[in-house]
């Protein structure tokens, strides 16, 4: 397999955008792949498309809108659940969790990597600031990498350079990569789809768990600069 192709799971958020720039500096070819899983706000996909264009990287969207028919999450556009509560199917998880979402995403990215002859997949997951999602943890990523390679007789690596970075460290990484302004102004994190108010850390409602996590990280990043 060609060693210089990397397929990235891309949402247009802080994590995957920082990851895309990191990968662009390391691989000859980088391909961004997003997923339309009937998420609550189309702004996420719109931001991803714009960022891909700014970075001059190819971007594919895979439709997965059937997901809301087979499972439950407050992130689905037809959900009446208010974000910030426990998940209806598992009280130990937040209701923004989409069961098996990352497993499905990674499986499709693995198939796409095989089609391209790529030996690397990169994900912007982190267990330092993982919002309570078990499918962002290193043990899960290593397990699914092993299972998918066994099932396809391949040796595709799943790279997770942000795995042990918190949001403050990710802001520092974006600065070191020269894209801090891009990350602040163009990426989307807010669960409410708010793009009208630009805060110091980026656009958002300033209230949802995603905004609070990003805000806290930016404040820590700023404090560490002093």
Curated annotation (Swiss-Prot):
Its cofactor is Zn(2+). Pfam families: QueC. Binds 1 zinc ion per subunit. The keyword Nucleotide-binding applies. ATP binds at residues 10-20. It catalyses: 7-carboxy-7-deazaguanine + NH4(+) + ATP = 7-cyano-7-deazaguanine + ADP + phosphate + H2O + H(+). Keywords: ATP-binding, Ligase, Metal-binding, Nucleotide-binding, Queuosine biosynthesis, Zinc. GO terms for biological process: queuosine biosynthetic process. Pathway: Purine metabolism; 7-cyano-7-deazaguanine biosynthesis. Coiled coil: none annotated. Zn(2+) binds at residues 190, 205, 208, 211. Its EC number is 6.3.4.20. The keyword Cytoplasm does not apply. GO terms for molecular function: ATP binding; ligase activity, forming carbon-nitrogen bonds; zinc ion binding. Gene3D superfamilies: HUPs (3.40.50.620). NCBIfam families: 7-cyano-7-deazaguanine synthase QueC. Belongs to the QueC family. HAMAP family: QueC. PANTHER family: 7-CYANO-7-DEAZAGUANINE SYNTHASE (PTHR42914:SF1). Catalyzes the ATP-dependent conversion of 7-carboxy-7-deazaguanine (CDG) to 7-cyano-7-deazaguanine (preQ(0)). This is 7-cyano-7-deazaguanine synthase. The gene is queC.
């Amino acid at each position: 397999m060609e060693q210089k192709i990397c397929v990235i799971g891309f949402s247009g958020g802080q994590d995957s955008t920082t990851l895309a720039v990191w990968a662009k500096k390391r691989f000859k070819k980088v391909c961004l792949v997003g997923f339309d899983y009937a998420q609550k706000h189309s702004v996420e996909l719109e931001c991803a498309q714009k960022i891909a264009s700014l970075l001059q990287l190819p971007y594919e969207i895979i439709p997965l809108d059937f997901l809301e028919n087979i499972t439950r999450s407050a992130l689905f556009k037809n959900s009446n659940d208010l974000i910030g509560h426990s998940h209806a199917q598992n009280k130990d998880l937040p209701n923004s969790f989409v069961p098996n979402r990352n497993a499905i995403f990674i499986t499709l990215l693995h198939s796409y990597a095989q089609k391209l002859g790529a030996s690397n997949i990169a994900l912007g997951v982190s267990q330092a600031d993982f919002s309570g999602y078990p499918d962002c943890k290193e043990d899960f990523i290593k397990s699914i990498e092993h299972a998918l390679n066994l099932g396809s007789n391949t040796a595709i690596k799943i790279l997770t350079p942000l795995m042990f970075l918190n949001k403050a460290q990710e802001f520092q990484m974006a600065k070191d990569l020269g894209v801090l302004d891009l990350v602040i102004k163009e990426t989307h994190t807010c669960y409410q789809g708010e793009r009208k108010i630009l805060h110091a850390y980026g656009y958002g409602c300033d209230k949802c768990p995603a905004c609070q996590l990003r805000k806290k990280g930016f404040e820590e990043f700023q404090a560490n600069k002093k």
